[in-house]
A protein has these predicted regions:
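Flexible, solvent-exposed loop/hinge segments and secondary-structure transition points
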Residues: 1-142
Length: 142
């Protein structure tokens, strides 16, 4: 696949939402970015709390900006807080270095990232991975 299409982004979104329903977790916001960082799709389930859209976007944006899933970014923040703080300053505070931001890959090609927020970071990540894999792509959570 040369780039992440809107149709594929919708498949990722729909499958991630289906996983959330299956797991009976708290309402989620899911954002899918392409490799340029452009929003392909975003959706909020009914009942999401304030700031969830910004958090979901920040998880995907951080993963994409640094080329690592947000779980790895979280670990990097714990080990080298000064580095993540500096990068987040450059990114005008848009990085959210906690699990739930997952890179979308096809073979070795980076297509974009998914960010999920609303439940625990681990559950957010599970839904992101499910969406990506349902679209026949490789999920890289870090």
């Amino acid at each position: 696949m040369a780039e992440l299409t809107l149709d594929v982004a919708r498949k990722i979104l729909d499958a991630a939402l289906a996983k959330a329903v299956e797991k009976k977790i708290k309402p989620l916001v899911i954002t899918v970015l392409d490799a340029r960082g452009a929003v392909k799709v975003t959706a909020a389930q009914d009942g999401t709390s304030l700031m969830r859209a910004e958090i979901a976007h920040g998880k995907a944006y951080g993963a994409l900006a640094l080329g690592m899933g947000s779980r790895a970014l979280f670990q990097r923040a714990q080990e080298q807080a000064y580095f993540v703080s500096a990068v987040n300053t450059l990114a005008q505070g848009r990085l959210v270095p906690v699990p739930g931001g997952v890179l979308i890959q096809d073979g070795g090609k980076l297509l974009g990232a998914v960010g999920v927020s609303g439940d625990t970071s681990d559950n957010d990540e599970i839904c992101a991975i499910a969406g990506i894999e349902a679209a026949g792509l490789k999920a890289n959570p870090g």
